[in-house]
């Protein structure tokens, strides 16, 4: 439960480690140390901070980009790895919460992952991006409804989304309905397709982060990364595709529940920390005017259904557990098991749980 009235937070704007996990872990710990030296309680990293965003899938044909696949897979983060334990131990040693963005390696697949590690080194939750964006689907698998999660911490109720999940109204509402107080908004660099697609720009996506705060009456900590010349060299960006990815693209910010920016922006090609003090009492003022999952909602007109049924790719069935069912009576139109439906407290979000 929340015990702090003021939370000092840091949003990272820095260059990712260019598909080098070991170097990335070192940099993660160093940035966490810098944030703690500034008195921060929480540090937030951008989308796929480890081992870096897979820009290669946007820069050429799928057959061309495959040459990066093995390296990217090998340097992605497993949550049961020594690398992850190093970061968790650093959180404990430094006494800081770490909201991490990473390419998660699980078995033979990758997922766009995020997790929250508390100041005791315990992972409070991990989640996966529900639907990777466009060509990201050639790299990453999908998440589940259970990944729309908000957890109670001493900092407040904390949840997270990745990148263009902030353009998904239903996913946002699922978090609003869990009374999120601090929102983690993980973004990559905004230097991709800067001349071709305004929707990918920092201007548009920082506006999405800002409106998230206003809609949800929460603090939004938006973290991003910076593309360097070393990144361009690694990805063989040359005359044929120079306009597709450029140096810079950083845009990190912390927004108040009324949409105010709480610190100055850094230059787009600069590395550093955006730091602000979050006065948690501001949430009550914002909620008094607009609470879309409370007094400003109309559940009899519109409501969200969150289906928490989880489907594994394999189900083990033992013969002794198989029960032969009697044939249904002629008048029975459906043999489907009933679905349990519950409504979250003080919310117009329905939770649907499949029968076990």
UniProtKB/Swiss-Prot annotation:
Residues 7-280 form the CN hydrolase domain. The active site is at residues 47, 129, 163. Its EC number is 3.5.5.1. Residues 324-356 are annotated as: Disordered. Residues 332-356 have a biased composition (Polar residues). Changing residue 163 to A: 100% loss of activity. One of its GO terms (molecular function) is nitrilase activity. InterPro entries: C-N_Hydrolase (IPR003010), C-N_Hydrolase_sf (IPR036526), Nitrilase/CN_hydratase_CS (IPR000132), Nitrilases_CHs (IPR044149). It comes from the Bacteria. Keywords: Hydrolase. CDD domains: nitrilases_CHs (cd07564). The keyword Hydrolase applies. Pfam families: CN_hydrolase. It catalyses: a nitrile + 2 H2O = a carboxylate + NH4(+). Nitrilase that acts mostly on arylacetonitriles. Belongs to the carbon-nitrogen hydrolase superfamily. Nitrilase family. PANTHER family: ARYLACETONITRILASE (PTHR46044:SF14), NITRILASE (PTHR46044). Homohexamer. This is Nitrilase, arylacetone-specific. It comes from Alcaligenes faecalis. The lineage of its organism: Bacteria, Pseudomonadati, Pseudomonadota, Betaproteobacteria, Burkholderiales.
């Amino acid at each position: 439960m929340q015990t702090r009235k003021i939370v000092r937070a840091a949003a990272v704007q820095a260059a990712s480690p260019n598909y080098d996990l070991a170097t990335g872990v070192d940099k993660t710990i160093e940035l966490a140390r810098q944030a703690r030296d500034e008195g921060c309680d929480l540090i937030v990293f951008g989308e796929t901070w480890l081992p870096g965003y897979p820009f290669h899938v946007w820069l050429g044909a799928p057959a061309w980009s495959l040459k990066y696949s093995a390296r990217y897979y090998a340097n992605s983060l497993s949550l049961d790895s020594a690398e992850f334990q190093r970061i968790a131990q650093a959180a404990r040693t430094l006494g800081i919460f770490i909201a991490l963005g990473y390419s998660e390696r699980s078995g033979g697949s990758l997922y766009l992952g995020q997790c929250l590690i508390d100041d005791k080194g315990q992972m409070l939750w991990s989640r996966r991006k529900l639907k990777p964006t466009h060509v990201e689907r050639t790299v990453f698998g999908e998440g589940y409804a259970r990944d729309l999660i908000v957890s109670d911490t001493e900092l407040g109720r904390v949840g997270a989304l990745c990148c263009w999940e902030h353009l998904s109204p239903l996913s946002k509402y699922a978090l609003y309905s869990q009374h999120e107080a601090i929102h983690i908004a993980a973004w990559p660099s905004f230097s991709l397709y800067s001349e071709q697609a305004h929707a990918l720009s920092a201007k548009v996506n920082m506006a999405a982060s800002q409106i998230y705060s206003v809609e949800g009456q929460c603090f939004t900590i938006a973290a991003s990364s910076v593309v360097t010349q070393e990144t361009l060299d690694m990805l063989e960006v040359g005359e044929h595709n120079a306009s597709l990815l450029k140096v810079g693209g950083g845009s990190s910010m912390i927004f108040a529940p009324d949409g105010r920016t709480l610190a100055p922006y850094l230059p787009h090609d600069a590395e550093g920390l955006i730091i602000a003090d979050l006065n948690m009492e501001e949430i009550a003022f914002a909620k008094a005017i607009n609470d879309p999952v409370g007094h400003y909602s109309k559940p009899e007109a519109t409501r969200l259904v969150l289906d928490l049924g989880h489907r594994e790719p394999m189900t083990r069935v033992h013969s002794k557990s198989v029960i032969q069912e009697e044939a249904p009576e002629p008048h029975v139109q459906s043999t489907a098991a009933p679905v349990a439906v519950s409504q979250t407290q003080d919310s117009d979000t329905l939770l649907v749980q499949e029968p076990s």
